[in-house]
């Protein structure tokens, strides 16, 4: 499944970007990078786009969960395995559909690595208790809907963006996915009806 190269690329890009933000020190490989102080923010395009280093123990886009850290991590593992298996089952489907799954899988694995290993790698907590590194701070639009207000979008990372793009691809092109599967059945039914009438 060549589409898995997209998944691998997303995971690598996501982890490299997080190491550059948080910093990494691997003496035996001669790798040492300081990173940014937690909470620091650097403007890229004025106030519209900033690099803001935050960590969260919860879900995507800096959304925290009060309890159930282990449950969330285990659910992420199960979901990643499920998506990979589903992608294998759908290996003969339309490329765009498989691409959307590959993007979602890459993002899921990227954040899963943070949750499973970062606590141990950085000496901050035990296995499965790591925090997700977020840093893309963009002011896309304000939200004011049914009492919910958001003046600035949640801080996110490459993995979050990959999952979101994959889901949007599925939503936007869902009709074409369904039509492609239904077309052979419709053609077969029409052919049968024609033969019967003859």
Name what the model sees in each region.
Residues 1-198:
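Alpha-helical transmembrane bundles and membrane-interface segments of multipass inner-membrane proteins
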